[in-house]
C-alpha cells in the first residue's frame, strides 16, 4: 500500500470506496505521462504519443457532453432554488433525481472504484481564495486525472498540506446503470449532482468535459446566491488594468477577439466577478482543434506540447496529427495548463473590476448593427436572450438563417433561473460603472460578413473609450443606440439599413427577427423581474 501525502484509504471509505489497493495522489505531469503511455493499457484508457509531444486519447462514443443524462438531486437544499427542467416556462437540462436513485447510482460508482488503484487530484475551481471550491477528483483512469490537473487550478504544496475538499467528483466512466428504465432515466449513462452531499457522479461517459462543465454548473449555483456574478465568458486586461469581458456563443468570435496582443488574457471560458474584481475559475484552456493550423492560430498550436492532452484527434502511424479530420467528431479538443499561453495575467488569473462588457452575436439575418451601446435594462434583456444565428443551407441552395437563443450565453450550464444571473451581473456593472455593448460579428444587407478588420476597430473603440463619447442615433424597432461615426470603421456600415437596396428590405427582415426575440423572451415573463424587461426589447 502506498499512500501519498497523508491521504488514507479511510478517507476514501467515507465516500463509500473500499479496499483501495493504491492511491496515486496529485501525480506529477511526468508520472501521468508514463501512466498514460503504459503499453499494458487497453481501450479508452490508452494514450498515444504525438509528434508534438502531447498525449492523445479517445473518449469513446461520447465526444461531447451528454445533457440528456444530467440530473440533480431534488431535496430540501435544492427544491426551491434550482431552475428545474419540469417547472416554469424555460427549457433546461436540470432534471430532478430522487435521493433513492442517487443512492443507487452512488453505489454503482463506488463499487466500480473499490478494490482499484486510484488517482486522486485535489484542485481549486476559482482563482479567488475567498470563494473558490476545493474539489477532490477520484478516478481510475490516468488521463482523466491529467485532464483535471490541466483544467483546474493547481494548489501549491503549502495549500495541499491543508487541503479540505468541499466538493467530491467520483468518475466511474467504466460503469453504467442497468436499472435506468425502471428509474425513469434517459439511458444507462449518468452525470448526477447532489448539493447536500456536495458530490458529482459520472457513469458511462468518458468525456473529460463533464468534469469541467460539472464544476462550472456548481459555481453557477453557489456564487450568484452570494451576490457574485458567474459568467460564461472570456476576459482580458490592458497594461493599465482596464478589464473587459466577452460573452458569446460558439462561432461569434469570443476567443479570437479576446486574444489581443495589446492585452493580457485572464481566461477563455469561465469567470466570476466579486468584490475584488473578475477572476478565472480555471487553471487551463480547453480549445477546439478542428482545422487548427499554426498559421491561423499560432498560440493554440504552440500550446500543444508535452503536458497538453488531445482528445479524439486522428493520429497517423508516424505520430503526426491530422487536425482537418473530423470523422470521429467535429468537437476535437486539447486541454493544456494556462501557462502554455504566453500573454497571460500572472501569477493568479484575476484582475480588477470590468468596465467594458461585450455581448458578441453573429446575426445571420443582417438586421442588427455592428455595434450599439446598451442601457441597463437592454443589458439584461440581451443577456437573457443570448442571441446568435447561423446560415444553414437548404436543399435548394438557399441559405436561411437559423436563430439560437441561449440564456446568459450559456443556458446549458445554468443552475438558477436566468434572471438571477442578469440581476447579479447588472449590480456588479453598476457598482463598477461598467458599460455594455452589443457587437454583431455577423452579416449585413450586402450578404457579406462584417470584416474582422472592422470588428477589431469596433472593439478597439469600445476599449479605448471613444465609443462612449461618440454621438448616437436610435435604430427603430430595436431601439438601439448606434454611433454616427467611429475611428477606423467605414461609417456606411454602422447603420444596417444603409447596407440594403431600400430601407423597406431591412424593415421586413427586422420584423422577422423582432418577432423571434419577442417569442423567445416570453419564457421569462413568469417572474416579475422578467416581465419588467419586455419593454427593453424590440417593439413591433
Curated annotation (Swiss-Prot):
Q: Which domain of life is it from?
A: Bacteria
Location of the protein in the cell:
Cytoplasm
User: What cofactor requirement does the entry state?
Assistant: Mn(2+)
Residues reported in the UniProt entry to bind Mn(2+): 213, 232, 269
Molecular function GO labels: ATP binding; metal ion binding; phosphoenolpyruvate carboxykinase (ATP) activity
Enzyme Commission code(s) on record: 4.1.1.49
Q: Which residues carry this modification: N6-acetyllysine?
A: 87, 523
Catalytic activity of the protein: oxaloacetate + ATP = phosphoenolpyruvate + ADP + CO2
Q: Which residues make up the binding site for substrate?
A: 65, 207, 213, 333
A GO biological process of this protein is: gluconeogenesis
> Pfam families recorded for this chain?
PEPCK_ATP
- Please tell me whether the keyword Cytoplasm is annotated for this protein: yes
Q: Which InterPro entries match?
A: PEP_carboxykinase_ATP, PEP_carboxykinase_C, PEP_carboxykinase_N, PEPCK_ATP_CS
Q: How is the cofactor bound?
A: Binds 1 Mn(2+) ion per subunit.
Q: Name one GO cellular component term.
A: cytosol
Q: Which residues does ATP bind?
A: 213, 232, 248-256, 297, 333, 449-450, 455
- Cite the annotated pathway: Carbohydrate biosynthesis; gluconeogenesis
Assembly behavior = Monomer.
- Function of the protein: Involved in the gluconeogenesis. Catalyzes the conversion of oxaloacetate (OAA) to phosphoenolpyruvate (PEP) through direct phosphoryl transfer between the nucleoside triphosphate and OAA.
| Name this polypeptide is given | Phosphoenolpyruvate carboxykinase (ATP)
Origin organism of this chain? Answer: Escherichia coli O157:H7
